Regions:
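Hydrophobic alpha-helical transmembrane segments of multi-pass inner membrane proteins, especially
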Residues: 3-11, 15-206, 245-311
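Phosphate/oxyanion-binding loops and surfaces in catalytic or ligand/nucleic-acid-binding neighborhoods
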Residues: 14, 217, 338
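A juxtamembrane structural motif centered on a specific transmembrane helix
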Residues: 17, 287, 301-342
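Proline- and acidic/polar-enriched loop/turn elements at helix boundaries
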Residues: 21, 166, 225-226, 260, ...
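Glycine/serine-rich anion-binding loops at beta->alpha junctions
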Residues: 86-95, 136-138, 142, 218, ...
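Nucleotide phosphate-binding site architecture
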Residues: 108, 220, 314
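Interfacial segments of multi-pass membrane proteins
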Residues: 144, 150-163, 228-255, 319-337
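TM-adjacent membrane-interface loops and short helices in multi-pass inner/ER membrane proteins
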Residues: 192, 196-240, 251-255
Length: 342
């Protein structure tokens, strides 16, 4: 069921790209074909192989993140991609799925003494390592997705809740330090979100233009390829970060409603699986529960953050909208996550 709604969302995304950039449309079309072929291939294999090798995949992608940080393709001051000429590979997107798989395995081990604070520290370090690498790329948006996934899985695992309290307290203490560790443009984006009038032609420009673009679409939109804000480049990043704003300009609130509806139906599908596995008290049932919960957290948080950016109700963090934003790594990672659902 989820793959059907994913396909419908992908069609919306393709039409949106067709109205903006034909070259990107054809590239995304190829990415989607590869992604859906990969989805059915992985479905035929099943999640068991990836579960028993989750430790290997965790360290493999840690190595990928480190290599990306050192020799990755730099775009606007960020090193998030490995350039393979025909494809820019963003390891942090794919790693989300394997990070969830890794946590769902380690948090359900019967021989792991969660009453030991040392074991909790080990689990925390398994989160902190990729979080810091991604944060330093810098990619604050994806780093926050990893944080939400980790907090959610810890909350619903058998880890004593007092440790969760320690973790939340530590986060609150580190937030002021994090402010000074951020890049200047990241701090400016947050300040511009709080008060857009501080710099309407600078850091707040993208957010303001996104809101204008959504409003200009009205109910039925301007029509395919007839958008002005997007096609005339008043709206930057109109095929990636702000693809939803571009889509609403072309297809109106009517089109935007169906996009939100399809996302909601995917979330409901995964949530039903999550609830079903919650009541299975076997070790495999709890692994499946945590994996489904992690994927749900990943999809919901990424969708809400991107939509919030487009509507001007959340700071800009460079998060893509699954199936709608242009990008091979993003769409393939989401399909990977769906393919490994039990």
């Amino acid at each position: 069921m989820a793959v059907i709604f994913s396909l419908l969302l992908s069609i919306f995304g393709l039409f949106n790209l067709f109205g903006l950039n034909h070259d990107l449309f054809f590239r995304q079309f190829i990415y989607l074909i590869l992604g859906f072929l990969g989805y059915y291939f992985l479905k035929s294999i099943g999640p068991h192989f990836f579960r028993i090798n989750s430790n290997f995949f965790y360290w493999f992608f840690i190595a990928v993140l480190l290599i990306t940080f050192i020799v990755g393709l730099e775009v606007r001051g960020s090193k998030r991609w490995l350039n393979f000429y025909f494809f820019n590979f963003q390891g942090s997107e794919f790693f989300k799925v394997f990070f969830i798989l890794f946590l769902s395995e380690i948090l359900t081990k019967k021989n792991l003494l969660f009453n030991s604070f040392l074991n909790f520290i080990k689990i925390f370090l398994c989160f902190l390592l990729p979080f810091l690498i991604i944060f330093k790329q810098p990619d604050l948006g994806n780093a926050m997705i990893y944080f939400f996934i980790f907090i959610t899985l810890i909350m619903f695992s058998t880890v004593p809740k007092k440790y969760l309290g320690y973790l939340i307290g530590l986060v609150l203490l580190l937030v002021p330090i994090g402010w000074f560790v951020m890049k200047d443009y990241q701090r400016d984006r947050i300040l511009s979100f709080i008060n857009p009038h501080l710099d309407t032609q600078g850091t707040a420009y993208n957010m303001i233009q996104a809101v204008i673009t959504i409003g200009s679409g009205m109910f039925f939109g301007r029509g395919l390829g007839l958008s002005t804000q997007s096609r005339l480049f008043f709206l930057p990043e109109n095929t990636t970060d702000f693809a939803f704003a571009s889509l609403v300009e072309q297809f109106g609130f009517f089109g935007g409603f169906f996009v939100l509806l399809f996302f909601t139906l995917i979330f409901i599908y995964i949530a039903k699986k999550t609830i079903r596995f919650y009541y299975e008290k076997t070790e495999d049932g709890q692994k499946n529960f945590l994996y489904c919960l992690g994927i749900l957290t990943y999809f919901v948080s990424q969708t809400i953050i991107n939509l919030g950016m487009n509507m001007g109700i959340m700071p800009i963090t460079g998060i893509t909208l699954p199936f709608i934003s242009y990008g091979g790594s993003s769409v393939m990672a989401v399909l990977l996550g769906l393919a490994l659902l039990p």
